[in-house]
Amino acid sequence: MYKKILVALENSPADEAIVPHVAEMAKRLGSEVLLLHVADGWVARNFNQLKLAESEEMKTDRAYLEKIAVQFRAQGLTASTLLALGDPPKEILKAAESEKCSLIAMSSHGHRLLGDLIFGSTIHEVRHNTSIPVLLVRAEKK
């Protein structure tokens, strides 16, 4: 059913909610997993235009993606990584389309009101601008 699952990661504790769900689903369905993080700091947003060197944040993000990929591979799953640069919702949608993903998986913070305006916009934009199914798992508040 879901041949390739895109997992949008934040490099934050919220990822702990989505990773086990996707791993279990991928095992049961024989799905491939694409782990995606979108770096959206100043360097990331201007990286190509200004031919900038990779920032420490971007290096940390690459290492984080690989660490999570190793966890998936240790369970016998096929996992690849992608560090995208720019606006998170746009890059998630672009990667899901270009990589022919059949499911987008994300963690939700469960914000309300102002928090939705600030933090919930990525999920809102992704789920309202794709025909690909979106799996949301609520992250525990810590």
For each predicted feature, which ranges?
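Short secondary-structure boundary segments
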Residues: 37-38, 107-109, 138-139
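Intrinsically disordered or low-complexity boundary/linker segments at protein termini
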Residues: 1-17, 128-142
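Structural beta-alpha unit
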Residues: 70-104, 141-142
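General small-molecule cofactor/ligand-binding pocket signal
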Residues: 36, 80-84, 135
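Small/aliphatic-rich secondary-structure junction motif
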Residues: 3-49, 71
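A short acidic, glycine-rich active-site loop
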Residues: 52-63
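Glycine-rich, Arg-bearing micro-motifs that act as flexible, cationic patches
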Residues: 107-128
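Short, hinge-like loop/turn segments at secondary-structure boundaries
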Residues: 50-54, 98-100, 122-123
